């Protein structure tokens, strides 16, 4: 039996929504700011599907994910269809010159593992990792925006 655990984090990015959206929606670039994501490959014959590989230390997980909903500058929602069970959404909120990015991730954990591990401990690790990912994304966006300004 699998139990689902869900975590949400958000951050404000001092950049316009169009830039924030365009950088996040380029899924294959995610390993640049998500340290546990080793690779993302969008399938050429079906761009709604992508292969993901998560690796850290001695463990590695992979899964195939399908985009369930996409609304430009607002939301990308996904669910795994094979491999590591997970689902979630990334939401974007326009703050007229800045953007709020909210990431919600849910993942399936075997019930026996929940009993062994402290759910709160696991949750704190996941949320701190996701928050660090959003902070790296914010820094990535700011660096790209700065390069664009210097190029003009």
What kind of feature is each model-predicted range?
Residues 55-62, 109-113:
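Short, cysteine-centered beta-strand-loop-beta hairpins and adjacent loop/turn segments enriched
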Residues 14-17, 44-46, 69-73, 91-100:
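A short, structured loop/turn motif at beta-sheet edges
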Residues 1-12, 52, 98, 131, ...:
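Hydrophobic-ligand-binding modules of eukaryotic lipid transfer/binding families
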Residues 80-132, 139, 148-152:
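Beta-strand/loop substructures that line and gate deep hydrophobic ligand-binding cavities in soluble
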Residues 6-8, 60-64, 85-89:
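Short, surface-exposed coil-to-beta transition loops
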Residues 20-24, 30, 50-52, 67, ...:
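Hydrophobic pocket/interface hotspot
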